[in-house]
Amino acid sequence: ITRLKATEAMLIDAKEKAEESDRLKSAFLANMSHEIRTPLNAIIGFSSLLPHIEDAEERNHYISLINHNNELLLNIINDVLDLSKIEAGHIELSPVWCNLSDLIDESCTECQPNVPEGVTLKKRYPATPNLIKQDPMRIKQVLSNLISNALKNTVQGYVEISYETTPSETRISVSDTGRGIPEDKLGIIFERFEKADTFIQGAGLGLPICRSIMEHINGTIEVTSTVNKGSTFTVVFPCQVRPME
C-alpha cells in the first residue's frame, strides 16, 4: 500500500508539472503572438501610408516609426533564438582578456537612445580597474539586457551600473529607482514564460537569457527590490583577473 501511495504521489506530481509546463507554454505563445503582432501591424500600417504622403517631414516621421518597429521585432526574434540556443547548450564560450569598463561603456552607449526623459544613466567603476578573462560577447549580452530591463521600469531618477573584482570573480550590479518588483513576483521573473508586469513592452526574455548565460559560465544572478523605490540586479561569475598594464 505504501508503495502504491508513493507511486500515486509521483504520478500526481508529474501530472501537475506537465500541466504547469503546458500553461506556461500557452502563456508564452499568447504573449509572443501579441509582442510580434504589435510591431508587425505598425510596420504594415505605416508602410501602406507612405505612398500617399507627399510632405517630406511627415514621410520621414513614418519612416522613423517603421525603423523603430523593425528593430523591436528583430530584438524579439533574436531573444527567442538566443535563449533557445543557450538553454540547449549550443553556444561556445570564447574567454579573452577584456576591459569590463569598456564593455559597460559600449552597452550604455547602445542603450542611450532608450533612456527616458528624467532618467540618468550612471556608471561607477573601481579606482583601479582590472582586466577580466571571460567571453566579452556574453557579458555584454547580460549587461545590455539588465540595463534595458532597468530602463523599461524607470521613469524618474537613475539607472546605475557598477562592478568590483576579486582575484577569482567579478560582481556586476545594475540598480534603478524604478517601480520595483512585488515580493510575490520575485520568484518568477527569471522564468522564460513569465513577466512581472504584463504592461511592460517586451517578450519577457531578457532576464531568462541573463540567468541562462550565468548558469553556463557557473555564475549567479540575484535581485533585491522594493516596490516604488527600485531594484538591484547582481551577477557574480568566476574569472581570472589581472591588473591593467
Regions found by a protein language model. Give the residues of each.
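Primarily the dimerization/phosphotransfer
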Residues: 10-50
